[in-house]
């Protein structure tokens, strides 16, 4: 499920520490458990499926935010929404993730990045990264 993968990547990129992604995630390269996890990179596929690559690049840019670089972390659930907050000083970045459609998953901040979220409505697996000062 491509939408679930992109939401999982948002959690990985917002989580403290190095973002643990493997080569091939950006295309996404199929694989299984060891030893099937070491498939050869499909370089032809790198030119296609830009949705995951573009989202990973945008998430990598957000990792430069001071709240992610220096801030603490807090996890909680609000209704059916998983929330990951990173705060430093007066800046807070909040990742709101939903796997259900129809909900307004945004809380109150300025939207920096979203996926499957339009007109204040989540559509299936979706997320919003918002900033508060």
Pin down the residues of each PLM region.
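Carbohydrate-interacting/catalytic domains
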Residues: 2-9, 14-21, 25-133
């Amino acid at each position: 499920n491509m939408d679930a993968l992109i939401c999982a990547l948002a959690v990985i990129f917002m989580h403290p520490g190095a973002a643990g992604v493997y080569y091939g995630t950006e295309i996404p390269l199929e694989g299984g458990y060891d030893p099937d996890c070491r498939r050869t990179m499909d370089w032809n596929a790198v030119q296609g499926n830009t949705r995951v690559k573009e989202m990973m690049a945008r998430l990598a840019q957000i990792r430069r935010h001071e709240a992610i670089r220096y801030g603490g972390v807090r996890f909680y659930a609000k209704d059916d929404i998983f929330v990951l907050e990173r705060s430093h000083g007066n800046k807070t970045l909040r990742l709101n993730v939903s796997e259900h459609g129809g909900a307004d998953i945004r809380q109150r901040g300025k939207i920096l990045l979203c996926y499957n979220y339009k007109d204040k409505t989540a559509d299936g697996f979706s997320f919003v990264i918002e900033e508060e000062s």
